[in-house]
Amino acid sequence: MVYIDHNGRVWEKRPWDWRRIVELFVGIWFAIKQLFLTFLAPFTGNNNQANPRRGNGWGGGGGWGGGGGGGGGGGGGRPGSGSGGLRPNRRIGRIQPTMSCNMPAGGGUG
């Protein structure tokens, strides 16, 4: 692949210079940093409150819609819906054994 450097020279491939080595180590540093930040995210108090697109955490912006079905009803809401924060760790349920899964055979032909 052709590479054009910052001086306008055309190279067959990108040369190994000081800038490329520094970029490589900085990239590795930020990747390791982000990895550990994601490991520690549940234990920190920062819940991305400064991000205006995400609201405030786990759906703290509006309550859960209520009613529905036959006649509607008022918009219910969870208790403490404006608090934000992380949800508690809950068990989803047990993993079903393979024999109870309803899926087609390998080819999907019937």
Swiss-Prot record:
It is a single-pass type III membrane protein. Residues 51-110 are annotated as: Disordered. Keywords: Developmental protein, Golgi apparatus, Membrane, Selenocysteine, Signal-anchor, Transmembrane, Transmembrane helix. Residues 1-20 are lumenal. One of its GO terms (biological process) is determination of adult lifespan. It is found in: Golgi apparatus membrane. It comes from the Eukaryota. Residues 42-110 are cytoplasmic. The chain crosses the membrane at residues 21-41. Residues 56-85 have a biased composition (Gly residues). One of its GO terms (cellular component) is endoplasmic reticulum membrane. Plays a role in the life span. May be involved in regulating the redox state of the cell and possesses anticarcinogenic properties. This is Glycine-rich selenoprotein. It comes from Drosophila melanogaster.
